[in-house]
């Protein structure tokens, strides 16, 4: 088979795919090795890292095979392989090594080599050490609807930093996996490019650095540290609120990094326009790239998390027990992991098999608090107060949008936060049919992923109800 088939295939893909997608994922690839096998052919394509390989397999492999088959006049199978890479330079004997445990915030990752000076800016910065939490990777992150968009965007950045979605702003409640996701990007890039300059830190560490350098009048050191990065990962930028000097220095670093096409990923508990006491210059830039939310995990995702985490702990959890725990622990991944540890510890100490009865006993305090706090009546009152309508409107037949909308939101929350069935919820909303409740649940649930304002309102209501 002619080697020209691959170049012709790329030319066709360039016309069929959006330009940015083609330039990000297809153009940088080396030419495929084409082997004729009689009635069929194999195109071996070597991809530089696991993340690009998985993404190309899931998003483009079928399209590539179709184009190559058409050009070759016979079926072509795409064989994706990881490209061999030279081992990175050995660290000096006195360089700290990663121990795999969570590390203190604000640590350097990777050092630029002289051979890569064109790609990475050198600066008089501290000697880097590999201090990311190596356990927080894409492989250990359980995917689901709640984190689908954020995970997809993070994979894009890991595969092609500085190209698209810059900055990437990830927001959501406590314990939903934002930190895990940005560590995963850092670990992915570090594995692909060991000489990249990467820095993960919490916003409070940046504030501390600004204060320290302000006191010492050493702002050149601050610039050398932050302006020379290839990837900045910063958690909880809402902590910058009201700190004008910190915001000024972060703005300068932000502009310097974007100018050199370094990538910035931030997390927050709210979307950019919802950040209080932060300069509009910053929030407008936060919003200029891609803003994505991580939602509380849905039931199936919670079950998957429990099953995966329990396997890692070496004590697999039966599926029926995982469903029981997942139905009763809804807030976030952190609480879910806490519940799992309680169940596993209880089983270990009591030397009993893990079953629903044991899980109920292990979590009795948690279940008691939840049952006492979240009821349909409490939801109705909380939602009515939030939207400034009467509680009686929840049961009435009134249909103006100012009443119908909060009523649908209350039905949605009743389904999400209680164990009530659809008919039971309908009965508590003035004897409505279960199909009415189902419509409300689907409508609000569907809009939540698209409507930032609605999502924020629901987040506030959920946090209020859960105490």
UniProtKB/Swiss-Prot annotation:
Any one of the GO CC terms: plasma membrane
Sections of the chain in a coiled coil: none
Region (Domain III, AAA+ region): 131-347
Residues holding ATP: 175, 177-179
Swiss-Prot/TrEMBL GO biological process terms: DNA replication initiation; regulation of DNA replication
Cystine connections: none
Domain of life: Bacteria
Residue ranges of the region described as Domain I, interacts with DnaA modulators: 1-74
Localization per record: Cytoplasm
Region (Domain IV, binds dsDNA): 348-467
Keyword list, A-Z: ATP-binding, Cytoplasm, DNA replication, DNA-binding, Lipid-binding, Nucleotide-binding
Cross-referenced CDD domains: AAA, Bac_DnaA_C
Polar residues: bias regions: 112-127
Chain positions covered by the region annotation Disordered: 85-127
SMART domains found in the cross-reference section: AAA, Bac_DnaA_C
One GO MF term attached to the UniProt entry: lipid binding
Matching InterPro entries: AAA+_ATPase, Chromosome_initiator_DnaA, Chromosome_initiator_DnaA-like, Chromosome_initiator_DnaA_CS, DnaA_C, DnaA_dom, DnaA_N_dom, DnaA_N_sf
Pfam families the record matches: Bac_DnaA, Bac_DnaA_C, DnaA_N
Ranges where the record places region Domain II: 74-130
HAMAP family: DnaA_bact
Record-stated family: Belongs to the DnaA family.
UniProt comment concerning the protein's domains: Domain I is involved in oligomerization and binding regulators, domain II is flexibile and of varying length in different bacteria, domain III forms the AAA+ region, while domain IV binds dsDNA.
Subunit comment: Oligomerizes as a right-handed, spiral filament on DNA at oriC.
The protein, known as: Chromosomal replication initiator protein DnaA
Gene behind this protein: dnaA
